[in-house]
Amino acid sequence: MQITNSHFFSILLFLWAGPTAANNLPWQPITIADYVITSPASVELGKRLFAEPKLSGNNNISCQTCHHPDHGTSDGLSLGLGEGAEGIGPERMANSGIKKRVPRHSPTLFNLGHKSVIEQFWDGRVSFDPKAPSGFDSPAEDWLPKGLSSLTAVQATLPLTAQFEMAGNTGENEVIGAVRQRIDYAWPVVVERIIADDEYWAMLQNTYPDLQNRSQVNITHLANAIGDYINTQFRSFNAPIDAYARGEDMPLTESQKAGMALFYGKAQCDQCHSGALFSDQQYYSLGLPPMGPGRTRQWDPWARDVGRMGVSNQAQDAYAFKVPSLRNLAFTAPYGHNGAYATLEGIIKHHNNPIQALENYDRSQAILPAASKTLEFIDWVGFNDKREMQRIKQSIDIEPLQLSQEEIDQIIAFLDLLNEPDLIARIRDEQ
């Protein structure tokens, strides 16, 4: 990747003024005004729905199961086990009904309500589209209902209909049965479960005063509330780096200073992890190990994941995934679109020399609960395909960095400034 003029100028600022000068950060501090507007009643309803297993086909999993406060709004697993499994995080256990791991690492929820976020999911398959009837582009296509208020609300509708996430296997319940007919047939089934509960009906009336009777409730009322909850509860803009950006007295260690200079300099981290969210929201191939079943395209004969290409159908997007935010990394391991690395050191070393890291991947880095022999075979089948491995290598968008171990340690020290432990403690207390 080439260093742009603005990037070169930011390096000069660091060299001239020193990395301890707060106004050297090439982004403005986040404020409440940078987030989409939500209502307290909707947030309260969304909080309860977020933890509600009735939204799943077999009444045994909720949004919170895979986006848990104890695991930094993810699940602590490389690839999760969805509907039918038991337990939370790394203790989650498969049973005989689990036919497939969730093909991608559960993404974190921090700052999804920031107005600059215009696409969601690892491949960006949910985005704004003013030409679409609903105003959004999504896998539900024109079956997505009108009235959804945010990208996060749109996102909330989709796991409910996904077999390996929340809907369940064919023949197990009425939700997956409806999905098999048409995706929008499933949402009313879920809504019926919620409006049958008098307490939920009271909360819905409080949130949406225009509702006169239960039959008027549809999936948008539930999804908008879940979206408002996520967009509000997981705002992260009070980490030490934010205090530093605001010019507050925030002494840095020598390692953090050196790591900051590397982040915005030699290591070129900010070429992709830019701005206050530490993501340019673009898509790049890092050549991560082809672990797991992958989110295969409809007619793909291989168990693989081509990433953004599955949405764009552009060959140049093969194996490219959205740049994640770096906020709260200490709480959100493992790392990568398939959680291939259990440690920050591991994922940074992959950036340091992607091809070498791919060829010498240490499978013990993966955090995968024990499952059937079939699932465990699929976890590593991609490594057996030499042509697939070569395609992944040829897709890589980043150049080797040649960082020393000391420099990697310094970058990790800098990244600690992006953690907000008080926020994590609060959302754990409020779950």
At which residue positions do the language-model features occur?
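Periplasmic c-type cytochrome electron-transfer domains
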Residues: 22-431
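N-terminal signal peptide c-region/cleavage motif recognized by signal peptidases
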Residues: 16-19
